[in-house]
Amino acid sequence: MATTISAVILAGGQAKRMAGLDKGLQLLQGKPLYQHCLQRLTHQVSSISINANRHQAIYQQSGVEVFGDELEDFQGPLSGILTALERANTDFVLFVPCDSPFLPLNLCEKLQSAVENSKSLLAYANDGEREHPAFSLLSTQLKLPLRAYLQSGHRQMLQFFRQHKGISVDFRLQKQAFVNMNTLQDIEKYQNIYA
């Protein structure tokens, strides 16, 4: 039976480096950042939703399902990942951050190939120099271990991924795909690139 995969755009952060503005809603080339992600995921998976803890009504205008973290007291991206895994009706969930408008068009394909070839429950991207755990594919079988990990006070994605023998997948030929917009200056820098 074929592996089923859904995708979630992670937009639940506090955006401290962006003066608290909702990163996913900031405009790049006239379009909110999250919509760039949505567009690049559309041909990779059949079902996409958004994890957002603020401005949910605005995100819902995109026509996709929007949900907040179930755990209280903002606990980082793993909290959104846990909620997504617990809600999923697919075997795996593909995760991407809302502030990475150039994400790889073959992200799902390469991460899926890695988990299938290794029989691992998760895979995540690297660009040849840095790990990018927010670009990841996780089995829904990880929801109980992830809940236990968060309840024990841990928050580091890579630590959890390594504990569960996550496969780091090389995207060094697409390094630019992992550029993320952490500040308004980052967005300004890329306004005219790829236009």
Swiss-Prot record:
As recorded in UniProt, its EC number(s) are 2.7.7.77
Cited CDD domains: MobA
Q: Which SUPFAM superfamilies match?
A: Nucleotide-diphospho-sugar transferases
Which reactions appear under catalytic activity for this entry?
Mo-molybdopterin + GTP + H(+) = Mo-molybdopterin guanine dinucleotide + diphosphate
Listed binding positions for Mg(2+) are: D99
Name a single GO cellular component.
Answer: cytoplasm
The record's Pfam families line, in alphabetical order, gives: NTP_transf_3
Name the coenzymes or cofactors required: Mg(2+)
Q: Which family does it belong to?
A: Belongs to the MobA family.
- The protein's assembly and partners: Monomer.
Comment field on protein domains: The N-terminal domain determines nucleotide recognition and specific binding, while the C-terminal domain determines the specific binding to the target protein.
Question: What is known about what this protein does?
Answer: Transfers a GMP moiety from GTP to Mo-molybdopterin (Mo-MPT) cofactor (Moco or molybdenum cofactor) to form Mo-molybdopterin guanine dinucleotide (Mo-MGD) cofactor.
Q: Which HAMAP family match?
A: MobA
Instruction: Identify this protein by name.
Output: Molybdenum cofactor guanylyltransferase
Organism placement in taxonomy: Bacteria, Pseudomonadati, Pseudomonadota, Gammaproteobacteria, Pasteurellales
